[in-house]
């Protein structure tokens, strides 16, 4: 009871001091050729406009989503009109969505004073950690909570290990979520997945047989500092919270910081950029903690990273258009997983290699995993396709988690049957 009251007070205090986005809008822009992509890239790189890219300019069949501050609406509209670029407004007032989200969180805090964790709500970091503790306590024969490191701001990083025994280094699957702080549906889906595993073990033959052969390691919040900052200050924060010497800008993109074509295409050397790659590979302690743990273990067979948004299921590579050696098998597995996911509610996912499905992205977790011998490496971009973007309502958490579970389970079954 006390911890719930404490977190409720934190939420209330955080909401009062958070950045506001009154009148800010999200534009969806359709590009038709390379020249239009170039023009749009010039626009988003205009620092004085303070635009935030939600979906990057990449391919002609993929719309671009850009958050436009209210003070930049007129110049951006003028630019788009002058260049003949078609656009629509998908979010009329960003602050209105944020206010709804805040109200939902406060309402949920009141409900949870009964002591039950609501999986259909977004939670502060400590509430997620408390629930991880509860799962490990309730199912000690199957689950243990493991501290793998500390963040830049000295918060612990916790992983849940699901294992039926058989040695410390059995074949293993890594499930990652929340590496980009603002993608709240990924953290919420991950903690729901943790409860789903323990609930279905010995009841669902699929997950029971998976755990007979492999261990599952689940990191629900891969960027704790950033996640806390999204709830205390800036809901749309993406990066870590490390300090960059010589710059007023904070943090690096933890999914551009891995040693996989580091500092290559799709990254920036500008610390103020949302895709700043960091000073060197693994410069972010959150990334290094995962790398060290996985390398020390030495027997991971699968690495899955949960993100949002766009409804995509991708595999290596992100840093090159070159086909991965296992591309054909990975594509088959991903398509089967997407089909299983769609079987629940009809949610459609696009499947393909990262670089050609969305955009070039060097230094990603999944490419690092693949380059380090973890063959089954996948990225999920969860709901939606842009109507809410990163602000997916809490009412969609459980539907998203339930369908994602079907995709995850399909991949894990394939790993179970194709250990190498």
From Swiss-Prot:
Binding residues for a protein: 69, 71, 118, 122-123, 126, 162
Record has Transferase as a keyword: no
Root EC class: hydrolase
Cysteine pairings via disulfide bonds: 249-272
InterPro entries the record matches: CPA_M14_CPD, M14A-like_propep, M14A_act_pep, Peptidase_M14
Residue intervals of the Peptidase M14 domain: 121-415
Gene Ontology terms for molecular function: metallocarboxypeptidase activity; zinc ion binding
Prodomain residues: 17-113
Enzyme Commission number(s) of this protein: 3.4.17.-
Range of residues in the leader sequence: 1-16
Record's keyword terms, sorted: Carboxypeptidase, Disulfide bond, Glycoprotein, Hydrolase, Metal-binding, Metalloprotease, Protease, Secreted, Signal, Zinc
GO CC term (a single one): extracellular space
Glycosylation sites: 259
Quaternary state and interactors: Interacts with LXN.
Family: Belongs to the peptidase M14 family.
Name the UniProt record assigns to this protein: Carboxypeptidase A4
Species of provenance: Mus musculus (Mouse)
Native organism taxonomy: Eukaryota, Metazoa, Chordata, Craniata, Vertebrata
């Amino acid at each position: 009871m006390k911890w719930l009251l404490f977190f409720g007070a934190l939420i209330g205090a955080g909401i009062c001091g958070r950045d506001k986005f009154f009148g800010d809008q999200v534009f969806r822009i359709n590009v038709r050729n390379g020249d239009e992509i170039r023009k749009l890239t010039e626009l988003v790189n205009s620092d004085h406009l303070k635009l935030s890219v939600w979906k990057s300019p990449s391919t002609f069949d993929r719309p671009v989503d850009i958050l436009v501050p209210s003070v930049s609406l007129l110049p951006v509209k003028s630019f788009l009109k002058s260049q003949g670029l078609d656009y629509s407004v998908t979010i009329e007032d960003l602050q209105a969505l944020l206010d709804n989200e805040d109200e939902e969180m406060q309402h949920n805090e009141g409900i949870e004073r009964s002591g039950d964790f609501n999986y259909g709500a977004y939670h502060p970091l400590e509430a997620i950690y408390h629930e991880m503790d509860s799962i490990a306590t309730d199912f000690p024969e199957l689950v243990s909570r493991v501290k793998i490191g500390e963040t830049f701001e000295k918060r612990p990083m916790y992983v849940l290990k699901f294992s039926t025994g058989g040695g410390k280094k059995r074949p293993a699957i890594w499930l990652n979520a929340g590496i980009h702080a603002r993608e709240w549906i990924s953290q919420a889906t991950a903690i729901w997945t943790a409860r789903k595993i323990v609930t279905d073990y010995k009841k669902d033959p699929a997950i029971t047989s998976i755990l007979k052969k492999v261990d599952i390691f689940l990191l629900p919040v891969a960027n704790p500092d950033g996640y806390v900052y999204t709830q205390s200050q800036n809901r749309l924060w993406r990066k870590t919270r490390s300090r960059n010497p010589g710059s007023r800008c904070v943090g690096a993109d933890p999914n551009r910081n891995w040693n996989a074509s580091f500092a290559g295409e799709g990254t920036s050397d500008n610390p103020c950029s949302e895709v700043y790659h960091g000073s060197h590979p693994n410069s972010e302690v959150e990334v290094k903690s995962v790398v060290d743990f996985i390398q020390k273990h030495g027997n991971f067979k699968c690495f899955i990273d949960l993100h949002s948004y766009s409804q995509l299921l991708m595999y290596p590579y992100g840093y090159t258009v070159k086909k991965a050696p296992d591309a054909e098998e990975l594509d088959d597995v991903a398509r089967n997983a997407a089909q299983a996911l769609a079987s629940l509610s009809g949610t459609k996912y696009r499947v393909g290699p990262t670089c050609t499905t969305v955009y070039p992205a060097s230094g990603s977790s999944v490419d690092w995993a693949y380059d380090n011998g973890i063959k089954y490496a996948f990225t999920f971009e969860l709901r939606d396709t842009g109507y809410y973007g990163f602000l997916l309502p809490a009412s969609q958490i459980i539907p998203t988690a339930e369908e994602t579970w079907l995709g995850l389970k399909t991949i894990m079954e394939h790993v179970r049957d194709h250990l190498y």
